Amino acid sequence: MNNIKKIGLSALAGSLAMVSANAVDYTMSGEIASSFQTAKGDTGSTEASNGKGFGTETDLTFTAAGELDNGFTVDMLMGVDTAGALTNSSSQVTLGMGSLGALRLNHIGGSSANAIDDVTPNAYQEVWDGLSDGSNPSFFGSLNSSGSIEYRSAAYEYAGVGISGTLLYDPNSGLGANAPRGVGATSVSGQSATIKLTHASGLEVGGGLEEVDDASGIVGITSATNQVTGYVKYAVGPLSIGYQEAYEDNKAATGTVGGDQSATMTGIAYTAGDLTVSYGEATLTQEAIGATAATEEDFDSIQAAYTIGAMTISAAVSETTGVGGVAAQTFETNTLAVSFAF
């Protein structure tokens, strides 16, 4: 029988009681990204997005990390979006417990479910980036995130396969984090779970499940909802490929088009030194209900990125057909971007 082996097993010194931190390290990092984009739609609502222009966004990330007397670690992350009004765009606190895993409080974003909404390889951005009309194939992980608590297992190895998983509870699904000592008005809870299997050959298989118990009190969600996703990725040398599917079951949306939806995403990327090129496709399907036929929206994108030290130059040519479920409606964008990490 194979023994289960712990990867990176760390000894926990002293009592398990939580006590004061010995030392804290503070760091700040950031990114500046400027882009020029053209956009063109041929019919209907897409014409409102036609045009061209320059844009710049600046993101700052602050982290603090310390170790407790018993060997546990505490990490805090806060991301700040400075593109417009100063906004806290990401914030999490993580208690690392060595071989016991970690507990994370997702104040703003940061859930493991949301992190696997689209894992297909790309050189610049997800295939649907800049093409979405309000819905896109990466809907998985959107129900439970901010204001949630999550357990993340340590990584284990069994028969040469790395195994890890997460469990999340959100007491106010879809509403975001509460103010300090605040409570949610609806108290509609949700749960999420993810699993990931990795192998030294470069193969990775994973998936997740997300649900809202009773969403009748959530604005924009009219019933209990389940979401599920699964993906396969394989990397060998400079080549990486990925395939992912997702499905949303809106249990009480009988007679309503758009109640259930499904998505498929495919990507392939090749890296030669500092240059990466990729091609991706995705399809978002609003499932048929009764006599109403299903509608499809297709996305595709060709991308390239070249890195020179802290600078990355990226380009993307992207298109979607069937915008909003209308087969004759198309929308396309061309993007040239340069970013600096510091």
Give each language-model segment a name:
Residues 1-342:
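Outer-membrane beta-barrel proteins
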